[in-house]
From Swiss-Prot:
UniProt KW keywords: DNA recombination, DNA-binding
Domain of life from the UniProt record: Viruses
Lineage: Viruses, Duplodnaviria, Heunggongvirae, Uroviricota, Caudoviricetes
Coiled-coil segments: none
GO biological process: DNA recombination
Pfam families in the record: RecT (PF03837)
Name of this chain's protein: Recombination protein bet
Organism field: Escherichia phage lambda (Bacteriophage lambda)
Amino acid sequence: MSTALATLAGKLAERVGMDSVDPQELITTLRQTAFKGDASDAQFIALLIVANQYGLNPWTKEIYAFPDKQNGIVPVVGVDGWSRIINENQQFDGMDFEQDNESCTCRIYRKDRNHPICVTEWMDECRREPFKTREGREITGPWQSHPKRMLRHKAMIQCARLAFGFAGIYDKDEAERIVENTAYTAERQPERDITPVNDETMQEINTLLIALDKTWDDDLLPLCSQIFRRDIRASSELTQAEAVKALGFLKQKAAEQKVAA
């Protein structure tokens, strides 16, 4: 266990009245309960920093770890946790809501300002479709069973962020969307091979450019930028895979010129 992890665990234990508990035992308990998941020490430290910074209690679900699909975790603050950090802010001076079937408006008042911070969230933008299993079966979620309550939570949390500058913390609904988007990106956008171009391939390209009376700056780099959909301003920015494709294009052009001649 790292020193930073032990120190943060000790601060949490002291704050919740468990300072007599060994830090290692506390961490083990947290890993098995509120912070359950395959979290690295760095991720665990991040969770403890958030918990201590906002005075949240993991054993009452004010903060907990939400597992993502990359063997990591997303720190989630429950509605009770959001309520705590809002009410404990020294400048908080109350809030009210206006809600109908289409939207919910939250107003938070600060003691040091003349006008309230106001945020409106819309049902058609926030509501989520039912979850689906791999077999295609729909599972009713909170947006189906309690849509107005969920929208009210959304409005309160977004308004609190603007009013007090809360950052780096999410509610469960946001965490689920983050995990879904991360998984989609990982599945649809595989990591690009960034192996640099080797000297042999570069020499072949240069030879063909001379033979075709073309240049890097005027001809090949603009073409590569268009084909690979990124701004490429120097030959050194090409990867080996991209250079091979560019070489293939030049060879095709050379063959066409030879036939035409």
